[in-house]
UniProtKB/Swiss-Prot annotation:
Mn(2+) 2 binds at D299, D396, E398. The lineage of its organism: Eukaryota, Viridiplantae, Streptophyta, Embryophyta, Tracheophyta. GO terms for cellular component: cytoplasm. The active site is at K323, R400. This is Putative leucine aminopeptidase 1. It holds the Pfam family Peptidase_M17_N.
Amino acid sequence: MPNVVDPPQISFAAKDMDLTEWEGDILAVLVTETDVSKATSSSSRFTNAAAALAKLDGELGGLLSEASAEEEFAGRAGQSVALRLPTAPGLHGFKRVCLVGVGNNMPSSAAACRSTGETIAAVAKSAQARSAAVALASPPPGWVQGEDLRLNAAAAVASGVVLGLHEDRRYKSDSKKVHLKQVDLIGFGSGQEMGRKLQYANHVSSAVIFAKELVNSPANVLTPAVLAEEASNIASSYSDVLTATILDEEKCRELKMGSYLAVAAASANPPHFIHLCYKPPGGNVKRKLAIVGKGLTFDRFYLSLDNLLIVTKFVCIGGYNIKIGAVTTIELMKKDMGGSAALFGAAKALGQIKPPGVEVHFISAACENMISGTGMRPGDIVTASNGKTIEVDNTDAEGRLTLADALVYACKLGVDKIIDLATLTGYCRIALGPSIAGILTPSDELDKEVAAAYEASGEKFWRLPLEESYWEQMKSSVADMLNTGSPLGGAITAGLFLKQFVDEKVKWMHVDMAGPVWNYKKQEATGFGVSTLVEWVLINSS
Protein backbone atom coordinates (compact mmCIF):
# COMPACT_ATOMS: atom_id res chain seq x y z
CA MET A 1 0.00 0.00 0.00
CA PRO A 2 1.25 3.54 -0.71
CA ASN A 3 0.03 4.55 2.74
CA VAL A 4 -1.93 7.54 1.45
CA VAL A 5 -2.73 9.67 4.48
CA ASP A 6 -5.69 11.85 5.28
CA PRO A 7 -5.30 15.51 4.27
CA PRO A 8 -5.36 18.22 6.95
CA GLN A 9 -8.81 18.19 8.56
CA ILE A 10 -9.76 21.86 8.75
CA SER A 11 -13.13 23.40 9.48
CA PHE A 12 -13.82 26.59 7.51
CA ALA A 13 -16.45 29.17 8.46
CA ALA A 14 -17.37 32.52 6.90
CA LYS A 15 -18.23 35.21 9.43
CA ASP A 16 -19.59 38.75 9.28
CA MET A 17 -17.83 40.58 12.12
CA ASP A 18 -15.29 43.27 12.90
CA LEU A 19 -11.83 41.75 12.62
CA THR A 20 -10.88 43.30 15.99
CA GLU A 21 -13.55 41.16 17.69
CA TRP A 22 -12.22 37.82 16.50
CA GLU A 23 -10.70 35.44 19.04
CA GLY A 24 -8.13 32.77 18.29
CA ASP A 25 -4.43 32.14 17.69
CA ILE A 26 -3.52 34.14 14.60
CA LEU A 27 -5.31 36.86 12.66
CA ALA A 28 -4.10 37.17 9.05
CA VAL A 29 -5.12 40.43 7.37
CA LEU A 30 -4.97 40.71 3.57
CA VAL A 31 -3.54 44.13 2.76
CA THR A 32 -3.42 45.82 -0.65
CA GLU A 33 -0.92 48.48 -1.67
CA THR A 34 -3.68 51.11 -1.49
CA ASP A 35 -4.33 50.13 2.15
CA VAL A 36 -0.84 51.30 3.11
CA SER A 37 -0.29 55.05 3.33
CA LYS A 38 2.66 56.54 1.50
CA ALA A 39 2.63 59.60 3.76
CA THR A 40 5.46 59.64 6.30
CA SER A 41 3.87 62.22 8.60
CA SER A 42 0.77 60.17 9.40
CA SER A 43 0.54 58.54 12.83
CA SER A 44 -0.81 55.35 11.20
CA ARG A 45 0.58 53.70 8.08
CA PHE A 46 -2.89 52.54 7.05
CA THR A 47 -5.33 54.56 4.93
CA ASN A 48 -8.98 55.35 5.55
CA ALA A 49 -9.90 52.56 3.13
CA ALA A 50 -8.46 50.11 5.66
CA ALA A 51 -10.43 51.58 8.56
CA ALA A 52 -10.67 48.34 10.54
CA LEU A 53 -6.93 47.78 10.27
CA ALA A 54 -6.19 51.39 11.23
CA LYS A 55 -8.50 50.97 14.22
CA LEU A 56 -6.69 47.81 15.29
CA ASP A 57 -3.34 49.55 14.88
CA GLY A 58 -4.54 52.38 17.12
CA GLU A 59 -5.75 49.98 19.80
CA LEU A 60 -2.34 48.29 19.70
CA GLY A 61 -0.54 51.59 20.19
CA GLY A 62 0.80 51.71 16.63
CA LEU A 63 2.53 48.31 16.80
CA LEU A 64 1.38 47.36 13.30
CA SER A 65 2.61 50.64 11.83
CA GLU A 66 5.95 50.26 13.57
CA ALA A 67 6.48 46.64 12.52
CA SER A 68 5.38 47.21 8.92
CA ALA A 69 7.67 50.25 8.62
CA GLU A 70 10.66 48.32 9.96
CA GLU A 71 10.01 45.49 7.50
CA GLU A 72 9.28 47.95 4.65
CA PHE A 73 5.91 46.28 4.23
CA ALA A 74 3.95 48.04 1.46
CA GLY A 75 1.20 45.51 0.69
CA ARG A 76 3.01 44.10 -2.33
CA ALA A 77 2.17 40.55 -3.35
CA GLY A 78 4.41 38.07 -1.54
CA GLN A 79 5.19 40.40 1.38
CA SER A 80 4.20 39.50 4.91
CA VAL A 81 4.97 40.67 8.43
CA ALA A 82 3.95 38.83 11.59
CA LEU A 83 4.15 39.84 15.23
CA ARG A 84 3.33 38.33 18.60
CA LEU A 85 1.04 40.55 20.64
CA PRO A 86 1.63 41.27 24.33
CA THR A 87 -0.62 39.36 26.68
CA ALA A 88 -2.55 41.47 29.17
CA PRO A 89 -6.13 41.63 30.46
CA GLY A 90 -8.43 43.64 28.22
CA LEU A 91 -6.33 43.25 25.06
CA HIS A 92 -7.56 41.47 21.96
CA GLY A 93 -8.55 37.82 21.91
CA PHE A 94 -5.87 36.76 19.43
CA LYS A 95 -2.19 36.08 20.03
CA ARG A 96 -0.63 37.02 16.71
CA VAL A 97 -1.30 39.32 13.78
CA CYS A 98 0.07 38.72 10.30
CA LEU A 99 -0.21 41.29 7.51
CA VAL A 100 -0.21 39.57 4.11
CA GLY A 101 0.42 41.67 1.01
CA VAL A 102 -1.79 40.91 -1.99
CA GLY A 103 -0.67 43.58 -4.47
CA ASN A 104 -2.49 46.51 -6.01
CA ASN A 105 -5.93 44.94 -5.51
CA MET A 106 -7.39 41.89 -3.84
CA PRO A 107 -6.47 39.10 -6.31
CA SER A 108 -9.31 37.88 -8.47
CA SER A 109 -7.64 34.85 -10.05
CA ALA A 110 -7.91 31.46 -8.39
CA ALA A 111 -4.14 30.94 -8.61
CA ALA A 112 -3.34 34.23 -6.84
CA CYS A 113 -5.92 33.64 -4.10
CA ARG A 114 -4.64 30.11 -3.59
CA SER A 115 -1.09 31.45 -3.28
CA THR A 116 -2.33 33.85 -0.60
CA GLY A 117 -3.84 30.91 1.27
CA GLU A 118 -0.54 29.05 1.09
CA THR A 119 1.24 32.05 2.62
CA ILE A 120 -1.24 32.07 5.50
CA ALA A 121 -0.73 28.32 5.96
CA ALA A 122 3.03 28.81 6.24
CA VAL A 123 2.59 31.47 8.94
CA ALA A 124 0.07 29.33 10.86
CA LYS A 125 2.33 26.29 10.61
CA SER A 126 5.33 28.24 11.88
CA ALA A 127 3.30 29.53 14.84
CA GLN A 128 1.78 26.07 15.50
CA ALA A 129 -1.59 27.81 15.53
CA ARG A 130 -4.74 25.80 16.14
CA SER A 131 -7.08 28.51 14.89
CA ALA A 132 -6.71 31.30 12.37
CA ALA A 133 -8.77 33.99 10.70
CA VAL A 134 -8.35 35.46 7.23
CA ALA A 135 -9.67 39.02 7.12
CA LEU A 136 -9.74 41.79 4.54
CA ALA A 137 -8.18 45.14 5.41
CA SER A 138 -10.64 46.83 3.03
CA PRO A 139 -13.60 45.65 0.91
CA PRO A 140 -12.40 45.12 -2.69
CA PRO A 141 -14.12 47.15 -5.44
CA GLY A 142 -16.93 45.25 -7.14
CA TRP A 143 -17.57 42.84 -4.29
CA VAL A 144 -20.85 44.47 -3.25
CA GLN A 145 -22.66 43.14 -6.32
CA GLY A 146 -20.09 40.53 -7.29
CA GLU A 147 -21.13 37.56 -5.18
CA ASP A 148 -19.27 35.12 -7.43
CA LEU A 149 -16.05 37.07 -6.89
CA ARG A 150 -16.36 36.73 -3.13
CA LEU A 151 -17.33 33.06 -3.26
CA ASN A 152 -14.53 32.11 -5.62
CA ALA A 153 -11.91 34.13 -3.73
CA ALA A 154 -12.90 32.57 -0.41
CA ALA A 155 -12.82 29.07 -1.90
CA ALA A 156 -9.40 29.60 -3.49
CA VAL A 157 -7.92 31.02 -0.27
CA ALA A 158 -9.33 28.02 1.64
CA SER A 159 -7.81 25.62 -0.91
CA GLY A 160 -4.47 27.36 -0.55
CA VAL A 161 -4.56 26.93 3.23
CA VAL A 162 -5.23 23.18 2.96
CA LEU A 163 -2.60 22.63 0.25
CA GLY A 164 -0.08 24.84 2.05
CA LEU A 165 -0.40 22.83 5.26
CA HIS A 166 0.17 19.49 3.57
CA GLU A 167 3.57 17.82 3.84
CA ASP A 168 4.17 14.34 2.50
CA ARG A 169 6.20 12.75 5.31
CA ARG A 170 5.01 9.14 4.89
CA TYR A 171 8.50 7.84 4.33
CA LYS A 172 10.27 9.80 7.08
CA SER A 173 10.83 8.35 10.53
CA ASP A 174 9.87 11.59 12.25
CA SER A 175 6.40 13.04 11.90
CA LYS A 176 4.99 16.53 12.13
CA LYS A 177 1.47 17.23 13.28
CA VAL A 178 -0.76 19.78 11.63
CA HIS A 179 -2.09 21.86 14.51
CA LEU A 180 -4.48 24.10 12.56
CA LYS A 181 -8.08 22.92 12.89
CA GLN A 182 -10.27 26.02 12.43
CA VAL A 183 -10.09 28.84 9.88
CA ASP A 184 -12.59 31.71 9.83
CA LEU A 185 -12.98 34.02 6.84
CA ILE A 186 -13.97 37.59 7.69
CA GLY A 187 -15.19 40.08 5.10
CA PHE A 188 -15.88 37.55 2.35
CA GLY A 189 -19.60 37.33 3.13
CA SER A 190 -21.50 34.44 4.66
CA GLY A 191 -24.59 32.31 4.16
CA GLN A 192 -25.45 28.86 2.83
CA GLU A 193 -23.90 29.40 -0.61
CA MET A 194 -20.61 30.45 0.97
CA GLY A 195 -20.73 27.39 3.22
CA ARG A 196 -21.25 25.12 0.20
CA LYS A 197 -18.39 26.79 -1.67
CA LEU A 198 -15.99 26.31 1.23
CA GLN A 199 -17.01 22.67 1.54
CA TYR A 200 -16.40 22.26 -2.20
CA ALA A 201 -12.94 23.78 -1.80
CA ASN A 202 -12.18 21.32 0.99
CA HIS A 203 -13.28 18.35 -1.14
CA VAL A 204 -11.22 19.39 -4.16
CA SER A 205 -8.06 20.33 -2.25
CA SER A 206 -8.22 17.01 -0.38
CA ALA A 207 -8.47 15.24 -3.75
CA VAL A 208 -5.47 17.20 -5.04
CA ILE A 209 -3.48 15.99 -2.02
CA PHE A 210 -4.58 12.41 -2.74
CA ALA A 211 -3.30 12.75 -6.32
CA LYS A 212 -0.03 14.30 -5.10
CA GLU A 213 0.61 11.40 -2.75
CA LEU A 214 -0.08 8.86 -5.47
CA VAL A 215 2.51 10.49 -7.74
CA ASN A 216 4.99 10.95 -4.87
CA SER A 217 4.81 7.24 -4.02
CA PRO A 218 7.89 5.27 -5.13
CA ALA A 219 7.45 2.64 -7.81
CA ASN A 220 8.30 -0.24 -5.48
CA VAL A 221 5.29 0.80 -3.39
CA LEU A 222 2.82 1.98 -6.03
CA THR A 223 2.69 -0.91 -8.49
CA PRO A 224 -0.12 -1.32 -11.05
CA ALA A 225 -1.88 -3.66 -8.63
CA VAL A 226 -1.69 -1.15 -5.79
CA LEU A 227 -2.93 1.67 -8.04
CA ALA A 228 -5.90 -0.53 -8.93
CA GLU A 229 -6.48 -1.20 -5.23
CA GLU A 230 -6.43 2.52 -4.45
CA ALA A 231 -8.95 3.15 -7.23
CA SER A 232 -11.18 0.38 -5.88
CA ASN A 233 -10.98 1.94 -2.42
CA ILE A 234 -12.34 5.20 -3.83
CA ALA A 235 -15.29 3.34 -5.30
CA SER A 236 -15.89 1.54 -2.00
CA SER A 237 -15.80 4.83 -0.07
CA TYR A 238 -18.48 6.36 -2.32
CA SER A 239 -20.32 3.22 -3.34
CA ASP A 240 -23.61 5.10 -3.70
CA VAL A 241 -22.29 6.73 -6.88
CA LEU A 242 -19.07 4.90 -7.87
CA THR A 243 -18.31 1.37 -9.04
CA ALA A 244 -14.97 -0.22 -9.95
CA THR A 245 -14.07 -2.74 -12.64
CA ILE A 246 -10.50 -4.07 -12.77
CA LEU A 247 -9.48 -6.09 -15.85
CA ASP A 248 -6.56 -8.49 -15.51
CA GLU A 249 -4.12 -9.43 -18.25
CA GLU A 250 -6.21 -12.35 -19.49
CA LYS A 251 -9.33 -10.20 -19.86
CA CYS A 252 -7.34 -7.50 -21.67
CA ARG A 253 -6.07 -10.15 -24.05
CA GLU A 254 -9.66 -11.24 -24.72
CA LEU A 255 -10.44 -7.62 -25.58
CA LYS A 256 -7.45 -7.65 -27.99
CA MET A 257 -5.57 -4.85 -26.24
CA GLY A 258 -2.33 -5.74 -28.00
CA SER A 259 -0.91 -2.24 -27.88
CA TYR A 260 -1.28 -1.92 -24.09
CA LEU A 261 -0.09 -5.45 -23.35
CA ALA A 262 3.03 -5.01 -25.48
CA VAL A 263 4.18 -2.27 -23.10
CA ALA A 264 3.39 -4.36 -20.02
CA ALA A 265 5.10 -7.51 -21.32
CA ALA A 266 8.56 -6.86 -19.85
CA SER A 267 7.50 -6.31 -16.24
CA ALA A 268 7.21 -8.85 -13.44
CA ASN A 269 4.31 -6.76 -12.12
CA PRO A 270 1.22 -7.63 -14.17
CA PRO A 271 -0.91 -4.92 -15.79
CA HIS A 272 -4.24 -3.80 -14.34
CA PHE A 273 -6.79 -2.04 -16.52
CA ILE A 274 -8.81 0.21 -14.20
CA HIS A 275 -12.32 1.49 -14.86
CA LEU A 276 -14.31 3.52 -12.33
CA CYS A 277 -17.83 4.63 -13.21
CA TYR A 278 -19.65 7.54 -11.59
CA LYS A 279 -23.46 7.54 -11.89
CA PRO A 280 -25.40 10.43 -10.36
CA PRO A 281 -27.90 9.99 -7.54
CA GLY A 282 -31.32 9.35 -9.03
CA GLY A 283 -29.83 7.93 -12.23
CA ASN A 284 -30.93 10.74 -14.57
CA VAL A 285 -28.07 11.01 -17.10
CA LYS A 286 -27.96 13.71 -19.77
CA ARG A 287 -24.28 13.42 -20.73
CA LYS A 288 -21.67 10.68 -20.67
CA LEU A 289 -18.04 11.65 -20.20
CA ALA A 290 -14.80 9.70 -20.07
CA ILE A 291 -11.49 10.72 -18.54
CA VAL A 292 -8.52 8.59 -19.55
CA GLY A 293 -5.21 8.83 -17.69
CA LYS A 294 -1.80 7.45 -18.52
CA GLY A 295 -0.90 4.98 -15.77
CA LEU A 296 2.77 4.06 -16.14
CA THR A 297 3.76 3.47 -12.52
CA PHE A 298 7.38 3.38 -13.68
CA ASP A 299 9.17 3.97 -16.98
CA ARG A 300 12.57 2.26 -16.99
CA PHE A 301 13.45 3.59 -20.43
CA TYR A 302 15.41 6.53 -19.10
CA LEU A 303 19.19 6.48 -18.73
CA SER A 304 20.76 9.49 -17.01
CA LEU A 305 24.26 10.52 -17.97
CA ASP A 306 25.98 13.34 -16.08
CA ASN A 307 27.86 16.07 -17.91
CA LEU A 308 26.05 15.37 -21.16
CA LEU A 309 25.89 18.44 -23.36
CA ILE A 310 22.50 17.69 -24.89
CA VAL A 311 19.17 17.99 -23.12
CA THR A 312 17.32 14.99 -24.48
CA LYS A 313 18.12 12.48 -27.20
CA PHE A 314 17.07 8.96 -28.07
CA VAL A 315 19.80 6.33 -28.44
CA CYS A 316 19.69 2.59 -29.02
CA ILE A 317 21.32 0.58 -26.24
CA GLY A 318 21.12 -3.19 -26.28
CA GLY A 319 18.32 -3.10 -28.83
CA TYR A 320 16.15 -0.61 -26.90
CA ASN A 321 15.38 3.05 -27.42
CA ILE A 322 16.43 4.86 -24.25
CA LYS A 323 16.25 8.56 -23.42
CA ILE A 324 19.45 10.07 -22.12
CA GLY A 325 19.62 13.41 -20.38
CA ALA A 326 22.01 15.79 -18.67
CA VAL A 327 20.04 15.71 -15.42
CA THR A 328 19.76 12.66 -13.19
CA THR A 329 16.00 12.13 -13.13
CA ILE A 330 15.38 8.42 -13.65
CA GLU A 331 14.03 8.24 -10.09
CA LEU A 332 11.27 10.65 -11.14
CA MET A 333 9.87 8.23 -13.70
CA LYS A 334 7.45 7.26 -10.93
CA LYS A 335 5.54 10.39 -12.01
CA ASP A 336 4.63 8.80 -15.34
CA MET A 337 1.27 7.89 -13.81
CA GLY A 338 0.40 11.54 -13.13
CA GLY A 339 -2.49 11.40 -15.59
CA SER A 340 -4.14 8.53 -13.74
CA ALA A 341 -3.52 10.26 -10.40
CA ALA A 342 -5.39 13.31 -11.70
CA LEU A 343 -8.42 11.33 -12.80
CA PHE A 344 -8.60 9.27 -9.60
CA GLY A 345 -8.28 12.45 -7.56
CA ALA A 346 -11.17 13.89 -9.57
CA ALA A 347 -13.17 10.70 -8.98
CA LYS A 348 -12.62 11.04 -5.23
CA ALA A 349 -13.82 14.67 -5.25
CA LEU A 350 -16.84 13.92 -7.43
CA GLY A 351 -17.77 11.02 -5.16
CA GLN A 352 -18.20 13.61 -2.41
CA ILE A 353 -19.74 16.40 -4.51
CA LYS A 354 -22.19 14.09 -6.38
CA PRO A 355 -23.09 16.30 -9.38
CA PRO A 356 -26.41 15.44 -11.07
CA GLY A 357 -27.12 14.65 -14.70
CA VAL A 358 -23.71 13.37 -15.77
CA GLU A 359 -22.13 9.91 -15.98
CA VAL A 360 -18.33 9.83 -15.83
CA HIS A 361 -15.97 6.97 -16.67
CA PHE A 362 -12.43 7.08 -15.24
CA ILE A 363 -10.08 4.80 -17.18
CA SER A 364 -6.40 3.94 -16.78
CA ALA A 365 -4.38 1.19 -18.44
CA ALA A 366 -1.88 0.76 -15.59
CA CYS A 367 1.43 -1.03 -16.11
CA GLU A 368 5.21 -0.63 -15.99
CA ASN A 369 7.58 -0.09 -18.93
CA MET A 370 10.60 -2.22 -18.10
CA ILE A 371 13.49 -3.97 -19.85
CA SER A 372 13.59 -7.77 -20.10
CA GLY A 373 13.69 -10.63 -22.57
CA THR A 374 9.91 -10.64 -22.79
CA GLY A 375 9.57 -6.95 -23.66
CA MET A 376 8.71 -5.36 -26.98
CA ARG A 377 11.56 -4.52 -29.35
CA PRO A 378 12.08 -1.75 -31.88
CA GLY A 379 10.51 -2.92 -35.12
CA ASP A 380 7.78 -4.99 -33.46
CA ILE A 381 4.28 -4.61 -34.87
CA VAL A 382 1.42 -4.57 -32.37
CA THR A 383 -2.32 -4.49 -32.95
CA ALA A 384 -4.61 -2.23 -30.93
CA SER A 385 -8.14 -3.22 -29.94
CA ASN A 386 -9.67 -1.28 -32.85
CA GLY A 387 -7.68 -3.42 -35.29
CA LYS A 388 -5.11 -0.78 -36.25
CA THR A 389 -1.49 -1.92 -36.46
CA ILE A 390 1.46 0.00 -35.05
CA GLU A 391 5.13 -0.38 -35.88
CA VAL A 392 7.10 0.27 -32.71
CA ASP A 393 10.02 2.37 -33.86
CA ASN A 394 10.63 3.68 -30.34
CA THR A 395 10.13 1.56 -27.23
CA ASP A 396 10.22 4.68 -25.06
CA ALA A 397 7.11 6.10 -26.72
CA GLU A 398 5.08 3.66 -24.66
CA GLY A 399 2.48 5.89 -23.02
CA ARG A 400 0.59 6.45 -26.26
CA LEU A 401 0.46 2.69 -26.82
CA THR A 402 -1.34 2.18 -23.51
CA LEU A 403 -3.63 5.16 -24.14
CA ALA A 404 -4.59 3.80 -27.56
CA ASP A 405 -6.42 0.79 -26.12
CA ALA A 406 -7.82 2.86 -23.26
CA LEU A 407 -9.34 5.35 -25.74
CA VAL A 408 -10.88 2.54 -27.80
CA TYR A 409 -12.38 1.10 -24.61
CA ALA A 410 -13.80 4.51 -23.65
CA CYS A 411 -15.42 5.00 -27.05
CA LYS A 412 -17.15 1.61 -26.77
CA LEU A 413 -18.89 2.88 -23.62
CA GLY A 414 -20.93 5.28 -25.76
CA VAL A 415 -19.53 8.46 -24.22
CA ASP A 416 -20.09 11.91 -25.71
CA LYS A 417 -16.75 13.46 -24.74
CA ILE A 418 -13.29 12.24 -23.75
CA ILE A 419 -10.36 13.99 -22.13
CA ASP A 420 -7.11 12.05 -21.85
CA LEU A 421 -4.27 13.25 -19.63
CA ALA A 422 -0.70 12.05 -19.86
CA THR A 423 2.87 12.90 -19.01
CA LEU A 424 3.42 12.10 -22.65
CA THR A 425 6.27 14.09 -24.21
CA GLY A 426 9.31 16.04 -23.18
CA TYR A 427 8.66 18.10 -26.30
CA CYS A 428 5.61 19.71 -24.71
CA ARG A 429 7.59 20.60 -21.60
CA ILE A 430 10.29 22.17 -23.76
CA ALA A 431 7.67 24.15 -25.68
CA LEU A 432 5.54 25.36 -22.74
CA GLY A 433 7.84 25.10 -19.74
CA PRO A 434 7.31 23.51 -16.34
CA SER A 435 3.92 24.95 -15.35
CA ILE A 436 1.72 24.85 -18.48
CA ALA A 437 0.01 21.79 -19.97
CA GLY A 438 -0.51 21.51 -23.70
CA ILE A 439 -3.94 20.64 -25.08
CA LEU A 440 -4.77 19.29 -28.52
CA THR A 441 -8.31 18.85 -29.79
CA PRO A 442 -10.25 19.07 -33.05
CA SER A 443 -13.27 20.37 -31.09
CA ASP A 444 -13.58 24.12 -30.51
CA GLU A 445 -16.62 23.45 -28.30
CA LEU A 446 -14.66 21.16 -25.99
CA ASP A 447 -11.79 23.64 -25.95
CA LYS A 448 -14.16 26.38 -24.71
CA GLU A 449 -15.52 24.10 -21.97
CA VAL A 450 -12.06 23.21 -20.71
CA ALA A 451 -10.95 26.85 -20.92
CA ALA A 452 -13.82 27.80 -18.61
CA ALA A 453 -12.80 24.94 -16.29
CA TYR A 454 -9.13 25.88 -16.03
CA GLU A 455 -9.92 29.57 -15.61
CA ALA A 456 -12.02 28.59 -12.59
CA SER A 457 -9.37 26.22 -11.22
CA GLY A 458 -6.37 28.49 -11.75
CA GLU A 459 -4.37 25.79 -13.55
CA LYS A 460 -2.55 26.69 -16.77
CA PHE A 461 -3.19 25.15 -20.19
CA TRP A 462 -2.34 26.20 -23.76
CA ARG A 463 -3.89 24.89 -26.97
CA LEU A 464 -1.46 23.55 -29.58
CA PRO A 465 -2.40 23.03 -33.24
CA LEU A 466 -3.42 19.53 -34.28
CA GLU A 467 -1.62 19.95 -37.60
CA GLU A 468 -2.82 17.13 -39.87
CA SER A 469 0.05 17.51 -42.36
CA TYR A 470 2.44 16.26 -39.67
CA TRP A 471 0.80 12.84 -39.90
CA GLU A 472 2.94 12.06 -42.95
CA GLN A 473 5.93 11.44 -40.71
CA MET A 474 3.93 8.88 -38.70
CA LYS A 475 3.28 6.58 -41.67
CA SER A 476 4.87 3.14 -41.70
CA SER A 477 5.81 1.05 -44.73
CA VAL A 478 4.78 -2.17 -42.97
CA ALA A 479 1.93 -1.16 -40.61
CA ASP A 480 -0.86 1.39 -40.34
CA MET A 481 1.37 3.80 -38.44
CA LEU A 482 4.57 4.32 -36.49
CA ASN A 483 4.40 5.12 -32.80
CA THR A 484 6.70 8.16 -33.17
CA GLY A 485 7.70 10.70 -35.78
CA SER A 486 10.28 13.45 -35.99
CA PRO A 487 11.25 15.26 -32.78
CA LEU A 488 10.09 18.43 -34.53
CA GLY A 489 6.50 18.93 -33.40
CA GLY A 490 6.72 15.81 -31.26
CA ALA A 491 3.88 16.83 -28.93
CA ILE A 492 1.62 17.41 -31.96
CA THR A 493 2.40 14.07 -33.62
CA ALA A 494 1.71 12.34 -30.30
CA GLY A 495 -1.75 13.92 -30.32
CA LEU A 496 -2.29 12.88 -33.95
CA PHE A 497 -1.37 9.31 -33.00
CA LEU A 498 -3.99 9.22 -30.22
CA LYS A 499 -6.62 10.66 -32.57
CA GLN A 500 -6.46 7.40 -34.57
CA PHE A 501 -8.13 5.59 -31.66
CA VAL A 502 -11.07 7.93 -31.07
CA ASP A 503 -14.40 7.66 -32.90
CA GLU A 504 -15.11 10.70 -35.06
CA LYS A 505 -18.49 11.27 -33.38
CA VAL A 506 -16.84 11.63 -29.95
CA LYS A 507 -15.51 15.04 -28.90
CA TRP A 508 -11.96 14.43 -27.70
CA MET A 509 -9.10 16.36 -26.11
CA HIS A 510 -5.56 15.29 -25.30
CA VAL A 511 -3.74 16.97 -22.39
CA ASP A 512 0.05 16.68 -22.27
CA MET A 513 0.92 17.45 -18.64
CA ALA A 514 4.60 16.44 -18.70
CA GLY A 515 5.61 19.86 -17.37
CA PRO A 516 3.19 20.76 -14.56
CA VAL A 517 2.90 17.28 -13.00
CA TRP A 518 6.03 17.91 -10.90
CA ASN A 519 7.39 20.85 -8.90
CA TYR A 520 11.16 20.56 -9.31
CA LYS A 521 11.85 23.33 -6.80
CA LYS A 522 9.89 21.62 -4.02
CA GLN A 523 10.72 18.13 -5.34
CA GLU A 524 7.15 16.94 -5.11
CA ALA A 525 4.09 16.27 -7.23
CA THR A 526 1.61 19.08 -7.83
CA GLY A 527 -1.69 17.22 -8.15
CA PHE A 528 -2.13 18.99 -11.48
CA GLY A 529 -5.36 18.39 -13.37
CA VAL A 530 -7.64 17.39 -10.51
CA SER A 531 -9.38 20.72 -9.98
CA THR A 532 -9.78 21.41 -13.72
CA LEU A 533 -11.32 17.97 -14.29
CA VAL A 534 -13.81 18.52 -11.46
CA GLU A 535 -14.77 21.92 -12.87
CA TRP A 536 -15.20 20.40 -16.34
CA VAL A 537 -17.53 17.71 -15.05
CA LEU A 538 -19.59 20.33 -13.19
CA ILE A 539 -19.87 22.38 -16.41
CA ASN A 540 -21.39 19.29 -18.05
CA SER A 541 -23.66 18.60 -15.08
CA SER A 542 -27.29 19.70 -15.32
